[in-house]
Design a protein with these regions (language model features):
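Extended hydrophobic leader/signal-anchor segments used for secretion and membrane insertion
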Residues: 1-260
Length: 260
C-alpha cells in the first residue's frame, strides 16, 4: 500500500513539473502559431504551423546585455499583436527599424532613400472574393454587425479577419514618406498584393512583438478561408478533416523547414 502511494505521488509530481515546464516554455521560450491567410505567400503558406521563438528579442534594457537577446533586424519574420486588435496575432516581415524613413513607390520599397533588395517578395494575383471566402453572407434581422477597418464581425464572430488584406489598391504608390517612431517597427507581408500591413495601419510597437518565426513544424493543405472560421462547428470540421486526411494533405516537404 505504501509502495502504491509512493508511485502515485511520483506520478503526480511528474505531471505537475511537466505542466510547469510546458507553461514556462510556451510563455517565455517558444509558442505554436498557424498561418491563416496568404499574406506571406509563397514563403509561408496557409496551413503552415510555426514555432515562434519568444525568447530571442526579450526585454530591452540593461539586463538584456547579460542574456542571449538581440534587437529585431530588418528581414526578420516576426509574429506580433495586431495594433488595431491586440488579441489577434499577425505574421509579417520586418522592413523598417526605429527612425527609418520608409517610402513605397509602386512595387519598390525605399528605406532611407535606398531601394530595398527583397528576394523574398511575391506578387500573387489574389483572385476573386469567392475564391477566398466562399458565398457572401447577407445579415438577417437581429444580427449585430460591427464594421472595422480590417474586419467584419457578426454577433461577435469575425467573418473575415482581413477583408482589406486581400484587396488593397495594388496600383497605389505611397509617395508620402513614413518615419518609423522610436521603439516601433514597420512590417509588410511578402505577398505584397495581398497583405494588410504597416502600409495601411502604421507601425508596430516593440512591446507588441510576440517573437520571431523559427521553423515550420507541420504544414497541412488548407482551404483559403478555413482558419478564418472560428465557430465551434467549424473547428470540429477542421479536426475531422485533419484526422481523415493527415497523411494525404500534409505537406511533408515543408516539415521542419527553417523560416527565412
Amino acid at each position: 500500500l505504501e509502495f502504491r502511494k509512493s508511485q502515485s505521488r511520483d506520478l503526480f509530481e511528474t505531471i505537475v513539473i511537466t505542466a510547469i515546464i510546458a507553461l514556462f516554455t510556451t510563455t517565455f521560450v517558444v509558442q505554436a502559431f498557424k498561418i491563416p491567410t496568404g499574406s506571406m505567400e509563397s514563403n509561408l503558406l496557409i496551413g503552415d504551423h510555426l514555432l515562434v521563438n519568444k525568447f530571442i528579442y526579450g526585454e530591452s534594457g540593461f539586463i538584456s546585455k547579460f542574456l542571449p537577446y538581440r534587437e529585431p533586424k530588418r528581414g526578420d519574420v516576426i509574429v506580433f499583436k495586431y495594433p488595431e486588435k491586440p488579441e489577434v496575432a499577425y505574421v509579417k516581415r520586418l522592413i523598417g527599424l526605429p527612425g527609418d524613413k520608409i517610402e513605397v513607390k509602386g512595387r519598390t520599397v525605399y528605406v532611407n532613400d535606398h531601394p530595398l533588395d527583397e528576394k523574398y517578395t511575391q506578387f500573387i494575383n489574389p483572385g476573386s472574393i469567392h475564391d477566398h471566402y466562399g458565398p457572401a453572407y447577407i445579415p438577417k434581422k437581429g444580427d449585430e454587425i460591427e464594421v472595422m477597418e480590417s474586419a467584419v464581425e457578426v454577433n461577435g464572430q469575425i467573418l473575415n479577419e482581413e477583408v482589406v488584406e486581400s484587396y488593397p489598391d495594388r496600383n497605389k504608390s505611397y509617395n508620402e514618406p513614413f518615419y518609423v517612431p522610436q521603439d516601433q517597427y514597420f512590417a509588410m507581408g511578402d505577398n505584397r498584393d495581398n497583405s494588410m500591413d504597416s502600409r495601411f495601419w502604421g507601425s508596430v510597437p516593440r512591446d507588441y512583438f510576440l517573437g520571431k518565426a523559427l521553423i515550420i513544424y507541420w504544414s497541412f493543405e488548407t482551404p483559403r478561408d478555413e482558419y478564418l472560421r472560428t465557430g465551434l462547428l467549424d473547428r470540429l470540421k477542421q479536426y475531422v478533416n485533419v484526422i481523415k486526411n493527415f497523411f494525404s494533405k500534409t505537406r511533408w516537404k515543408r516539415t521542419l523547414k527553417i523560416i527565412r
